[in-house]
Amino acid sequence: GGRKGDARRMSLTPIRVLCVGAGHMGRSHALAYHKLPGFQIVGLVTRSADSRAKLNAELGGGYAEYGDFHAALKATKPDAVSISSYPDTHAEYAVAALAAGCHVFVEKPLAVTVAEAEQIVAKAKEVKRKVVIGYILRHHPAWTQFIKTVQTLGKPLVMRMNLNQQSSGDNWKTHRALMQTCSPIVDCGVHYVDIMCLMTGSR
């Protein structure tokens, strides 16, 4: 009975999550952690005080706010870190979180260079922690069906990707800032390269 009781208590213990980033995806993930049972947000991290305050207010205003990731990581000691900040911060934050003993969810792209991505993978293996990347299309019903259908059509000989995202107003400011940290093919194109790999069974 003792072991079963311990397992039950462990299952009821919420996963303590530090949420990094308060943009579109950061907000989406924070809302999910806020609403889902089994998770407890221990802090909201973003460089913009206005963005932090706005997100915190949307979540009820009860969460600690931090402008510095490393200070937040040290202060909150989370079980997991959810990284939805600009791509050029992903490797630094992910490696630091893993080194602190945390599991990591990181929005795509994992990193802006192959070397940085390999550094994250190596650290995760070293400390035996999980890293999950936000490849949402892998789990989207329409895309999973599309992949299955394509695989019945025979061997693909040519694959072409055309990604056209309209941007204006405040969205353009965000997208322009993103393009200063990495190219669109790395930022968004990774979704479709990943799908191509799944279609062909190469990954």
Task: Name these PLM-found stretches.
Residues 29, 61-123:
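Beta-loop-alpha module in the N-terminal Rossmann-like domain of NAD(P)-dependent dehydrogenases
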Residues 43, 80, 158:
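Short, Asp-centered acidic motifs that coordinate Mg2+ and/or phosphate
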Residues 137-203:
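Predominantly a Rossmann-like dinucleotide-binding segment in NAD(P)-dependent oxidoreductases
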Residues 8-60:
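N-terminal Rossmann-like dinucleotide-binding module
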Residues 119-136, 154-161:
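Rossmann-fold dehydrogenase core element
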Residues 36, 59, 75, 140, ...:
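Acidic-histidine catalytic/liganding microenvironments
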Residues 89, 109, 132-139:
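Rossmann-like NAD(P)(H) cofactor-binding subdomain of soluble oxidoreductases
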Residues 39, 63, 102, 129-130, ...:
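Short, well-ordered coil/turn segments that N-cap beta-strands
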